Amino acid sequence: MRFSLQREVLLKPLAQVVNVVERRQTLPVLANLLVKVREGQLSLTGTDLEVEMVARTAVDDAQDGETTIPARKLFEIVRALPDGSKVTVTQQGDKITVQAGRSRFSLASLPANDFPSIDEFEATERVNVPEAGLKELIERTAFAMAQQDVRYYLNGLLFDLRDTTLRCVATDGHRLALCETALDGGSGSKRQIIVPRKGVQELQRLLEGGDRTLDLELGKGHIRVKRDDVTFTSKLIDGKFPDYEAVIPIGADREVKVDREALRAALQRASILSNEKYRGVRVEVSPGLLKISAHNPEQEEAQEELEADTRVDGLAIGFNVNYLLDALGALRDEHILLLLRDANSSALVRGAEHQHA
């Protein structure tokens, strides 16, 4: 096997797949990338047995073959080479030679036959999703995923397929984030799947936005996302996601409209003097005014006041300031709506201009 590519052309697919490879592995071959050259196309595959990423690019000067090469070493070598370098990778027995100009590196390889693949994938549903739409779904919801929760089904992101729409939902039991986008032509089916945290993070890193349409395929135990140059596959979490619609506040008729960035800045300032353990802030709403206060065990106190468009006579409610800041960071609207019922009920935060998140 042999191929030659410009450094920048090789670096892009390498960067796409190398993050899938774990730094510590149970199998030595999992530290490697599967490298294949077939009919003028180079494919690079990385996996941790839960997530698999395959990146492809065209090569002109190439000889067909396949092997596995240490992922991070190859990536670091190519990244460290000068811009504009022509990189030639050659296989000689169980050794891989990487050459660029006067630089030459020799790496150990493992047989391609030892490289594991994710279980056989058979798609039961296929939908087309705008890349920008899927990127937005993940960016606006992934922050609310649980981390290492014993309720394992919360350690991921729910994809709720509903004929003409796709929803993403995440919750850690304290807060919930939801966003939806329209599907091109609809799906004709309904299904819920849970993608694990690492799969969500790798998919988010992969998506670039833009006008491209992605092929999203759902199998019995996997999700696959296809783009011209990349195929992403992830195992699913086998569990039932909570009935999230039951916890979305209904009847929250006390509405506050406020500038998102102004509220975010005020919360950040007030949080400096909040209790470091509980991170609580008190939000008081009165006609035309939003008052934020925080205090800590040292008897220190912060107060912020903001002009707001309110439909509330008077109400005080406590929040974890980190949860509010995460929600405001995920929204993109200039103004947000804070929908309240009473001091003991959940609050709803959403964009004032685009109410799909």
Give residue ranges: language-model regions.
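Structural preference for solvent-exposed beta-strand-turn elements
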Residues: 1-357
